[in-house]
Amino acid sequence: MSVSFRDRVLKLYLLGFDPSEIAQTLSLDVKRKVTEEEVLHVLAEARELLSALPSLEDIRAEVGQALERARIFQKDLLAIYQNMLRNYNAMMEGLTEHPDGTPVIGVRPADIAAMADRIMKIDQERITALLNSLKVLGHVGSTTAGALPSATELVSVEELVAEVVDEAPKT
């Protein structure tokens, strides 16, 4: 598989060559005179493409918002799950209404188990998404800033795991 002219220019640029050195090097390789203007044109196109991409901070914010929405959705499901357990327990005691006057709704154990499975799956998805985003951001950060994810980012994983354990259904 041959590497395109554009890819060669970008690779040499990323290796630290300046445009005139790139033109000289590629002139030897492609058996024709490569001008510095050609190299600068390729680099300008690359900069234009890169400027259209979202910033690292925008990506972090989007990931944070998505994880927050998942956490809120999970809390809503957890409230439904707890209400299902409350109704099931009241039903098992033979009650037709709760002490607060609300009617007891019939709930099947399979429905409770399915809801618990869904809540646990959301936990797993949230943790996996956060860890994957930290890996990606850590990799990008390490190539651009020479650092892995910050300690505060790693602490947030521990807090998330603790939150998941605290919110896990108690049976």
UniProtKB/Swiss-Prot annotation:
It comes from the Viruses. Signal peptide: none annotated. Keywords: DNA-binding, Viral genome packaging, Viral release from host cell. GO terms for molecular function: DNA binding. Pfam families: TerS_C, TerS_N. The keyword Transit peptide does not apply. Homononamer; forms a ring-like structure through which genomic DNA is translocated into the capsid. Heterodimer with the terminase large subunit; the active complex is probably heterooligomeric. Belongs to the P23virus small terminase family. The terminase small subunit binds to the packaging initiation site and regulates the ATPase activity of the terminase large subunit. The terminase lies at a unique vertex of the procapsid and is composed of two subunits, a small terminase subunit involved in viral DNA recognition (packaging sequence), and a large terminase subunit. Both terminase subunits heterooligomerize and are docked on the portal protein to form the packaging machine. This is Terminase, small subunit. It comes from Thermus phage G20c.
